[in-house]
Amino acid sequence: MEKRIRELTSLLNQYRQEYYTNDNPSVSDQEYDKLYHELIDLEKEYPEYIQKDSPSQAVGGLILSGFEKYQHPFPLYSLQDAFSKEELEAFDRRVKSEFPKAEYIAELKIDGLSISLSYESGRLVTGATRGDGSVGENITENIKKIKDIPHQLKDDITITVRGEAYMSRSSFQKINLERQENGETEFANPRNAAAGTLRQLDTSIVARRELASFLYQEASPSQAQNQEDVLENLEALGFSVNKKRLISSSMEDIWSFITQVEDERDNLSYDIDGIVIKVNNLAMQEELGFTIKAPRWAIAYKFPAEEKEAEILSVDWTIGRTGVVTPTANLTPIQLAGTTVSRATLHNVDYIAEKDIRIGDTVIVYKAGDIIPAVLRVVDTKRDQQLPMPIPKVCPSCQSDLVHLEAEVALRCINPLCPSLIQRSLEHFASRNAMNIAGLGPAIVEKLFSAQLIHDVADIYQLSLDSLLTLEGIKEKSAQKLLDAIQSSKSNSADKLLFGLGIRHVGAKASRLLLETFGSVENLMKADDQSIAQIDGLGHVIANSIKNYFAKEEAKQLIFELKDKGVNLDYLGKKVDTSAQLFGLTVVLTGKLEEMTRQEAKEKLENMGAKVTGSVSKKTDLVIAGSDAGSKLDKARSLGIDVKDENWLLQL
């Protein structure tokens, strides 16, 4: 083994020299990675033979065994999207109803990967991906390879900042040319290339792919008065900040800026997919607050999707985890928004009928939300003798009759034993936002299901090395990795489990809200629908769905089986104390507080069980008003909402 380690060390150092110094690599990234992983595996097993000049020991590169989860100290919210001027005007009206003199700042929406950087005493200590907004991946070593991200700030401060890592168009073209010459699959677009690069385990690959960044937010408490100050502060600290922006109180000015940027976007050296409009004043931002998903003080205008013509060659009908049958068109390949597209969703049978879509039609294809290829309409002038689309009457997986339920647009398979439905449910359970079982993807699920090794999610936890090795193409090392991932998933917070169960209408955020309130899946099973419905952000639809799911004996049995197999049923995040003095109340803070900061007041209220929101409505239970309270206090009084002062809060 010592001889092989020496050989690999020498060979890889030669390849590194070719790449970094000579700019003339003789092997592909794929071949380099393969040899690199062989070396690192051997070095782990025989550490006594590690060479001093091993690439794994070099400053320029580091092999990572994987990425640890990282709990963000401050949530990374997504933004509300807008696709029209009318939606921006509606946003403007909402903001101006609270702050008539509000000023906006418009910034470019960089098409890259969201990152969060934490510094202590000016030193970079953590770089992480966004993940689900609460938990991301720690990619610090890769972040350090982005040249314009400082390792040490110009000021010895402790701060968390947010921004976007991206790949320039020139770097993207250079990398794809190299991959083409090496016979490797090309990246679809710069965003995919940037995302794939930051998940590399070999940091030297990250270094040579020349990523860049733009920072735009101080996530930790800021001394700045407005967003413009934030950007100037970030630049003064040594970060790269995009200089193309506009400040105005007029949405007409903002729209003119959007139009100008859209006309010029092809001349930029990097990709953008829209414009982000924020309330400039940070105090106003705090007053406006957040919904369950996004800030009320910002909106992301997305540029209209690019459209291309393609011919429908055939249609596939597939079953989702809830039994919904989705038609997908197979197309003549086209280049669309930087990717090659050969399939596009047709949504549902009602959509096909409404648009009169037929096999053989020439259609207009676009990317819905700039992500999912979809058929927009038929090019009628190019229709010949195409026949109406044949609609399936039976499930393509289990041959059961399909149903078209009243008030639904989708065909649905309602056979609980449908193989496709079960497999999709298993895939969902193992997915990243659910139980995050790495290695248990669609291909492995299909093999396990076909071999009758798993029938429901509880069966996942009785898989063994011997049973996995009976599957074709599964080696001992990959089987053990899968078992380790399964074992690790047992300790997930129970909101991940709840989401993984695939209960209708219960998404990831609803799962977290439910478990924050009830503390465990077992407590939730015993909860009445009224106590569920009163949780802010949920309602009766989700409450009924939860009640109906746990009313089924097989659902209860599944939970008990998972518990017996060691799966955690408790919520591991911060729980809501249902006995707290203000539990269940929706509270709004307004005006200037004298003895407390607004953040201190917010934290005290939340610790007492209240939900603090940014705007007054009929759902508001209480308003705490400081001095110089304005329109929110007036609105509270007009609605008959109870109003208290700061002294009342201090005495609680």
Curated annotation (Swiss-Prot):
Cofactor(s) annotated in UniProt: Mg(2+); Mn(2+)
Record's protein name: DNA ligase
Functional note: DNA ligase that catalyzes the formation of phosphodiester linkages between 5'-phosphoryl and 3'-hydroxyl groups in double-stranded DNA using NAD as a coenzyme and as the energy source for the reaction. It is essential for DNA replication and repair of damaged DNA.
PROSITE patterns noted in UniProt: BRCT (PS50172), DNA_LIGASE_N1 (PS01055), DNA_LIGASE_N2 (PS01056)
The species this protein was found in: Streptococcus uberis (strain ATCC BAA-854 / 0140J)
Catalytic activity: NAD(+) + (deoxyribonucleotide)n-3'-hydroxyl + 5'-phospho-(deoxyribonucleotide)m = (deoxyribonucleotide)n+m + AMP + beta-nicotinamide D-nucleotide
Binding site for Zn(2+): C395, C398, C413, C418
Keywords: DNA damage, DNA repair, DNA replication, Ligase, Magnesium, Manganese, Metal-binding, NAD, Zinc
Cellular component per GO, a single term: cytosol
Recorded family membership: Belongs to the NAD-dependent DNA ligase family. LigA subfamily.
Documented EC number(s): 6.5.1.2
Domain BRCT: 577-652
Pfam families linked: BRCT, DNA_ligase_aden, DNA_ligase_OB, DNA_ligase_ZBD, HHH_2, HHH_5
GO biological process: DNA repair; DNA replication
Binding site for NAD(+): D29, Q30, E31, Y32, D33, S78, L79, E107, R130, E164, K278, K302
Catalytic residue positions: K109 (n6-amp-lysine intermediate)
InterPro entries: BRCT_dom (IPR001357), BRCT_dom_sf (IPR036420), DisA/LigA_HHH (IPR041663), DNA_ligase (IPR001679), DNA_ligase_AS (IPR018239), DNA_ligase_CS (IPR033136), DNAligase_adenylation (IPR013839), DNAligase_N (IPR013840)
Listed GO MF terms: DNA binding; DNA ligase (NAD+) activity; metal ion binding
